[in-house]
Amino acid sequence: MVYTATPLEKKVTVNTLRKMKADKEKFITVALYDAPMAAMAQKCGVEVVLIGDSLGMTVLGYDSTVPVTMEQMIYHIEAVARGNSRSLIIGDLPFMTYATVEQTMINATRVMQAGAHMVKMEGGAWLVDSVRMLSERGIPVCAHLGLTPQSVNKFGGFRVQGRSEEQGEQIIADALALEEAGADLLVLECIPAELGARVTQALSIPTIGIGAGIGTDAQVLVINDILGLTEFPPKFSKNFLLEAKDIPGALQKYAADVKSGVFPGPEQQF
């Protein structure tokens, strides 16, 4: 069946995404940062919008996400929330704003009050206490495993994670621990496609992949990559504007290719 992107008719919730996973229906995620793009995403049927700390590199000109501040995140979350009333909106907690449980509570509250419906944090089992605390207090959580860009200095660069059997098993163990603690979604970034599929099958919560293969429940790309604005695009990305006449067309093409299983192709996987 050919998928045709249509505007979202109802507000997307965590339950919407759980049902889509159960029905084996892929959902669309786009990382973007302003009201006009947020409104366009809603019109193009994008179920999930992520305001990522990737804005440090895509919007602010930093060479990593490490310098991004809470104030910068709040500014862009508020802008996106004003432009989109139906997609599920996820807001990132930036570098070192969730190092302790108390700090996590304070900053997650700010993200939610800015208009997000869920907060995202990078890290493995060390986050379990913070995830459980937020979940028990009614704040939905999106976890993030694999290549976690805030740890780029520890990794020695933006490198694929989970290639060894030991690394892969650790990612699976962390994913299960985060789910048990109450995480509602999980982003998997830059891991082998086979591992992305294994993690997805092991969890009851939906997974969102970026460079994690075609076996995840959803895909996410940064709007800059979708529109070909990145000077040195990552392997997992694709310029969809080349196959469309305008920006809405590029978003619709991205959505259609994800829904139909065309994207990511072999050339976008590890």
From Swiss-Prot:
Gene3D superfamilies linked to this entry: Phosphoenolpyruvate-binding domains
Pfam families referenced in this protein's UniProt entry, alphabetically: Pantoate_transf (PF02548)
Binding site for Mg(2+): D53, D92, E122
Gene: panB
EC number: 2.1.2.11
Active site residues of this protein: E189
Summary of the function given for this chain in its UniProt record: Catalyzes the reversible reaction in which hydroxymethyl group from 5,10-methylenetetrahydrofolate is transferred onto alpha-ketoisovalerate to form ketopantoate.
Similarity section: Belongs to the PanB family.
Pathway noted in the entry: Cofactor biosynthesis; (R)-pantothenate biosynthesis; (R)-pantoate from 3-methyl-2-oxobutanoate: step 1/2
Domain of life: Bacteria
Enzyme class, spelled out: transferase
Name the record gives this protein: 3-methyl-2-oxobutanoate hydroxymethyltransferase
Main location: cytoplasm
One cellular-component annotation, GO: cytoplasm
